[in-house]
Design a protein with these regions (language model features):
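Extended, folded cores of ATP/NTP-driven motor/assembly subunits in large transport
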Residues: 1-230, 234, 239
Length: 239
Protein backbone atom coordinates (compact mmCIF):
# COMPACT_ATOMS: atom_id res chain seq x y z
CA UNK A 1 0.00 0.00 0.00
CA UNK A 2 1.40 3.34 -1.02
CA UNK A 3 2.18 5.82 1.73
CA UNK A 4 0.02 8.89 1.10
CA UNK A 5 1.54 10.94 3.94
CA UNK A 6 3.56 13.86 2.70
CA UNK A 7 7.04 14.31 4.11
CA UNK A 8 8.73 17.70 4.03
CA UNK A 9 12.42 18.41 4.19
CA UNK A 10 13.66 20.64 6.98
CA UNK A 11 15.65 22.66 4.48
CA UNK A 12 12.49 23.61 2.58
CA UNK A 13 10.50 24.55 5.69
CA UNK A 14 13.37 26.21 7.55
CA UNK A 15 12.20 29.80 8.19
CA UNK A 16 15.62 31.42 8.69
CA UNK A 17 17.57 32.99 5.85
CA UNK A 18 20.81 33.98 7.57
CA UNK A 19 22.43 35.30 10.74
CA UNK A 20 24.41 38.51 10.28
CA UNK A 21 26.15 40.51 13.00
CA UNK A 22 24.21 38.64 15.67
CA UNK A 23 20.84 39.37 13.99
CA UNK A 24 18.59 36.59 12.69
CA UNK A 25 17.06 37.34 9.28
CA UNK A 26 14.01 35.29 8.31
CA UNK A 27 12.90 34.41 4.79
CA UNK A 28 10.15 37.02 5.22
CA UNK A 29 12.86 39.59 6.02
CA UNK A 30 11.94 39.83 9.71
CA UNK A 31 14.87 40.95 11.87
CA UNK A 32 15.40 39.26 15.25
CA UNK A 33 17.87 39.86 18.09
CA UNK A 34 18.33 37.03 20.62
CA UNK A 35 19.25 37.28 24.30
CA UNK A 36 20.00 34.80 27.05
CA UNK A 37 18.08 35.80 30.17
CA UNK A 38 19.24 35.35 33.76
CA UNK A 39 16.23 35.37 36.09
CA UNK A 40 16.11 35.61 39.91
CA UNK A 41 16.19 32.35 41.81
CA UNK A 42 12.82 30.84 42.58
CA UNK A 43 11.07 32.13 45.73
CA UNK A 44 13.63 34.92 46.25
CA UNK A 45 11.55 37.84 44.89
CA UNK A 46 9.28 39.87 47.16
CA UNK A 47 5.95 41.35 46.10
CA UNK A 48 7.44 44.82 45.61
CA UNK A 49 10.36 43.41 43.61
CA UNK A 50 7.95 41.46 41.43
CA UNK A 51 5.99 44.66 40.79
CA UNK A 52 9.24 46.41 39.85
CA UNK A 53 10.18 43.60 37.46
CA UNK A 54 6.76 43.78 35.83
CA UNK A 55 7.08 47.55 35.42
CA UNK A 56 10.55 47.14 33.88
CA UNK A 57 9.19 44.76 31.25
CA UNK A 58 6.41 47.19 30.34
CA UNK A 59 8.80 50.16 30.24
CA UNK A 60 11.28 48.28 28.05
CA UNK A 61 8.64 47.13 25.58
CA UNK A 62 7.40 50.69 25.10
CA UNK A 63 10.73 51.74 23.55
CA UNK A 64 10.34 49.23 20.70
CA UNK A 65 8.92 50.48 17.38
CA UNK A 66 5.54 49.52 15.97
CA UNK A 67 5.05 45.98 14.65
CA UNK A 68 7.65 44.54 17.03
CA UNK A 69 7.28 41.10 18.62
CA UNK A 70 8.60 40.21 22.08
CA UNK A 71 8.95 36.46 22.58
CA UNK A 72 10.25 35.11 25.91
CA UNK A 73 10.94 31.38 25.88
CA UNK A 74 11.51 29.27 28.98
CA UNK A 75 12.97 25.87 28.16
CA UNK A 76 12.48 23.10 30.73
CA UNK A 77 14.19 19.83 29.79
CA UNK A 78 13.97 16.79 32.04
CA UNK A 79 17.47 15.48 32.70
CA UNK A 80 19.42 13.50 35.29
CA UNK A 81 21.99 15.24 37.45
CA UNK A 82 25.62 14.49 36.69
CA UNK A 83 28.39 15.45 39.14
CA UNK A 84 30.79 18.13 38.00
CA UNK A 85 34.17 16.76 37.06
CA UNK A 86 36.43 19.74 36.39
CA UNK A 87 39.56 17.99 37.63
CA UNK A 88 39.87 20.06 40.81
CA UNK A 89 40.14 18.40 44.19
CA UNK A 90 36.83 18.58 46.04
CA UNK A 91 36.19 18.84 49.73
CA UNK A 92 34.35 16.12 51.61
CA UNK A 93 31.12 18.17 51.76
CA UNK A 94 31.24 19.07 48.07
CA UNK A 95 31.88 15.47 47.04
CA UNK A 96 29.07 14.24 49.32
CA UNK A 97 26.71 16.84 47.83
CA UNK A 98 27.51 15.74 44.28
CA UNK A 99 27.05 12.06 45.10
CA UNK A 100 23.78 12.74 46.93
CA UNK A 101 22.16 14.20 43.80
CA UNK A 102 23.90 11.90 41.32
CA UNK A 103 21.50 10.65 38.60
CA UNK A 104 18.48 12.28 40.23
CA UNK A 105 15.92 13.68 37.76
CA UNK A 106 15.49 17.44 37.57
CA UNK A 107 14.27 20.13 35.17
CA UNK A 108 17.09 21.99 33.46
CA UNK A 109 15.89 25.55 32.82
CA UNK A 110 17.15 28.05 30.28
CA UNK A 111 15.48 31.33 29.32
CA UNK A 112 15.80 33.18 26.02
CA UNK A 113 14.33 36.43 24.75
CA UNK A 114 13.72 37.26 21.08
CA UNK A 115 12.97 40.79 19.86
CA UNK A 116 11.64 40.82 16.29
CA UNK A 117 10.94 43.68 13.90
CA UNK A 118 8.26 42.76 11.40
CA UNK A 119 6.02 44.87 9.16
CA UNK A 120 2.40 45.90 8.89
CA UNK A 121 1.98 43.72 5.82
CA UNK A 122 2.85 40.58 7.75
CA UNK A 123 -0.08 41.12 10.12
CA UNK A 124 -2.60 41.58 7.31
CA UNK A 125 -1.32 38.94 4.93
CA UNK A 126 -4.06 36.92 3.26
CA UNK A 127 -4.30 34.51 0.38
CA UNK A 128 -5.30 37.36 -1.94
CA UNK A 129 -2.36 39.48 -0.77
CA UNK A 130 0.49 37.33 -2.02
CA UNK A 131 3.77 38.28 -3.63
CA UNK A 132 2.13 37.81 -7.03
CA UNK A 133 -0.22 40.74 -6.32
CA UNK A 134 2.26 43.00 -4.58
CA UNK A 135 4.72 43.37 -7.43
CA UNK A 136 7.77 43.12 -5.13
CA UNK A 137 9.10 40.32 -2.94
CA UNK A 138 10.12 42.17 0.23
CA UNK A 139 8.20 44.88 2.09
CA UNK A 140 9.64 48.30 1.30
CA UNK A 141 9.86 49.10 5.01
CA UNK A 142 12.20 46.23 5.78
CA UNK A 143 14.63 47.21 3.00
CA UNK A 144 15.10 50.65 4.57
CA UNK A 145 18.45 50.73 6.40
CA UNK A 146 17.23 53.49 8.71
CA UNK A 147 14.36 51.28 9.88
CA UNK A 148 16.79 48.50 10.84
CA UNK A 149 19.12 50.99 12.53
CA UNK A 150 16.28 52.48 14.60
CA UNK A 151 15.16 49.00 15.64
CA UNK A 152 18.67 48.05 16.79
CA UNK A 153 18.91 51.29 18.76
CA UNK A 154 15.62 50.50 20.51
CA UNK A 155 16.92 46.99 21.25
CA UNK A 156 19.92 48.51 23.01
CA UNK A 157 17.58 50.70 25.07
CA UNK A 158 15.49 47.63 25.89
CA UNK A 159 18.58 45.76 27.09
CA UNK A 160 19.77 48.72 29.16
CA UNK A 161 16.39 49.16 30.88
CA UNK A 162 16.16 45.50 31.85
CA UNK A 163 19.76 45.29 33.09
CA UNK A 164 19.35 48.49 35.10
CA UNK A 165 16.35 46.97 36.88
CA UNK A 166 18.75 44.93 39.02
CA UNK A 167 16.62 41.78 38.93
CA UNK A 168 17.01 40.49 35.36
CA UNK A 169 20.16 40.23 33.26
CA UNK A 170 20.11 40.13 29.47
CA UNK A 171 23.10 38.98 27.44
CA UNK A 172 22.94 39.37 23.70
CA UNK A 173 23.89 36.25 21.75
CA UNK A 174 26.64 36.47 19.16
CA UNK A 175 26.47 34.91 15.70
CA UNK A 176 28.45 31.78 16.69
CA UNK A 177 26.18 31.25 19.70
CA UNK A 178 23.17 31.21 17.37
CA UNK A 179 24.52 29.22 14.43
CA UNK A 180 27.05 27.13 16.35
CA UNK A 181 30.57 26.05 15.45
CA UNK A 182 32.26 22.74 14.74
CA UNK A 183 33.02 22.33 18.45
CA UNK A 184 29.92 23.83 20.11
CA UNK A 185 26.22 23.60 19.36
CA UNK A 186 24.41 26.85 18.64
CA UNK A 187 20.94 27.97 19.65
CA UNK A 188 19.39 26.74 16.41
CA UNK A 189 20.94 23.29 16.80
CA UNK A 190 19.79 23.08 20.43
CA UNK A 191 16.31 24.15 19.38
CA UNK A 192 16.05 21.44 16.73
CA UNK A 193 17.44 18.70 19.00
CA UNK A 194 15.73 19.65 22.30
CA UNK A 195 19.06 19.71 24.06
CA UNK A 196 20.84 22.27 26.22
CA UNK A 197 24.21 20.57 25.88
CA UNK A 198 27.02 22.64 24.36
CA UNK A 199 28.40 19.65 22.49
CA UNK A 200 27.20 19.22 18.92
CA UNK A 201 23.90 17.33 18.93
CA UNK A 202 22.68 14.72 16.47
CA UNK A 203 19.66 15.97 14.54
CA UNK A 204 16.72 13.56 14.60
CA UNK A 205 13.37 13.23 12.87
CA UNK A 206 10.75 15.83 13.77
CA UNK A 207 7.19 14.54 14.12
CA UNK A 208 4.37 17.11 14.01
CA UNK A 209 0.91 15.65 14.49
CA UNK A 210 -2.34 16.97 15.97
CA UNK A 211 -1.91 16.91 19.73
CA UNK A 212 1.65 15.57 19.59
CA UNK A 213 5.08 16.98 18.79
CA UNK A 214 8.21 14.89 19.04
CA UNK A 215 11.90 15.15 18.14
CA UNK A 216 13.54 11.75 18.18
CA UNK A 217 12.34 10.11 21.40
CA UNK A 218 11.76 13.45 23.16
CA UNK A 219 8.23 14.80 23.44
CA UNK A 220 7.28 18.46 23.60
CA UNK A 221 4.85 20.09 25.99
CA UNK A 222 4.13 23.71 25.05
CA UNK A 223 2.41 26.43 27.07
CA UNK A 224 1.72 29.84 25.53
CA UNK A 225 1.00 32.93 27.61
CA UNK A 226 -0.03 36.09 25.75
CA UNK A 227 0.60 39.53 27.20
CA UNK A 228 -3.04 40.60 27.29
CA UNK A 229 -4.00 37.38 29.13
CA UNK A 230 -1.02 37.30 31.49
CA UNK A 231 -1.82 37.85 35.17
CA UNK A 232 -0.52 40.95 36.88
CA UNK A 233 1.79 40.61 39.90
CA UNK A 234 -1.11 41.40 42.22
CA UNK A 235 -3.27 38.70 40.61
CA UNK A 236 -0.49 36.15 41.16
CA UNK A 237 -0.16 37.19 44.80
CA UNK A 238 -3.92 36.83 45.39
CA UNK A 239 -4.26 33.45 43.62
Amino acid sequence: MRNVLKAETLERRFPLLSVENGCIVSKDADLTVAFEVELPELYTVTEDEYEAMHSSWIKAMKVLPEHSIVCKQDWFIQETYRPKSDGEEQSFLTRSYELHFNERPYLNHRCYLFLTKTTRERSRRRSDFSTLCRGFLLPREITDKDTAARFLESVEQFERIMNDSGHIRLRRLETDEITGTEERAGLVEKYLSLSLEDESAVLQDICLKPGRMRIGDKRLCLHTCLLYTSPSPRDVEES
